[in-house]
Each structure stands twice: as structure tokens, then as C-alpha cells.
Amino acid sequence: MNSKHSYVELKDKVIVPGWPTLMLEIDFVGGTSRNQFLNIPFLSVKEPLQLPREKKLTDYFTIDVEPAGHSLVNIYFQIDDFLLLTLNSLSVYKDPIRKYMFLRLNKDQSKHAINAAFNVFSYRLRNIGVGPLGPDIRSSGP
């Protein structure tokens, strides 16, 4: 990728068992299949993400789904300064979010994006709570 910016990979270590999770949900449309979607754990947080009502996530967060080989796909994203500060303040893991980042999809996830010809219909960050053992898991540590 020939880019003006350096994209940093968002690693799995930002997901901490026993804490609420922000889930990146991507709906694809087009290609050889209909209604392809992905749910990707994005970030463990101390409290739910709340954005101002008058704004949409797309005002703060832009994604681009691109091939990273013959059968693998990366999701690139650019994060507005407001959302960047908000996510880093909510994150369980200290300051993991940068303005320009990407996620590597595994083969199964990549297959969905490829079948939809990388055509993103919509995306969102959804707050997911912890299960009944979350507090116990959190106190015992990973």
C-alpha cells in the first residue's frame, strides 16, 4: 500500500477478558452473495461508548476494506481526533488507538469480504456487556 500515512495494526491484546467490548459490525452488500456481515471484537472498554446524538459514527470513523493478498483482507480505518481521545480514555488497555490503523482478517472473515467484493453497506461500533462470570474473570487476570 502506497500511503501518505503509516497505518498501525490493532492487535488482539486490546481485548481483555472480563471487560465490556466494543464490537465492530460491518454489513457488506453486493458481489456473489447477499447480506454478508462481520462482527469483530474491536476494543475492551471500562464503560460504554456514547457519541453525541447529532453526529453519526461515520463523522468520526472511516473504514476501507482492501485485499491483502489472494485470500486475505485488511480493514483500514481513520479515526477523528475526538473519537481517538474518547476511545483511548475508555480503553482497558492503555492508549492503544492511533489515528490510522488496520485490522487483519482471518481467512473465514476475509472470505465474507471477498464474496461481497469489498462493498461496505454500513458499519457501527456496538457496546457489548460482560457475561455473568466477567467480574470473576477480570479479577483473576489473563
Curated annotation (Swiss-Prot):
GO molecular function: RNA binding; structural constituent of virion
Localisation: Virion; Host cytoplasm; Host cell membrane; Host nucleus
InterPro entries in UniProt: BDV_M, BDV_M_sf
Assigned keywords, A-Z: Host cell membrane, Host cytoplasm, Host membrane, Host nucleus, Membrane, RNA-binding, Viral matrix protein, Virion
Key word Cell wall biogenesis/degradation present: no
Topology of this chain in the membrane: Peripheral membrane protein
An example Gene Ontology CC term for this record: host cell plasma membrane
Major localization class: virion
Protein's job: Plays a crucial role in virion assembly and budding.
Assembly notes: Homooligomer. Forms homotetramers. Interacts with phosphoprotein P. Binds to ssRNA.
Protein name: Matrix protein
Organism annotation: Borna disease virus (strain V)
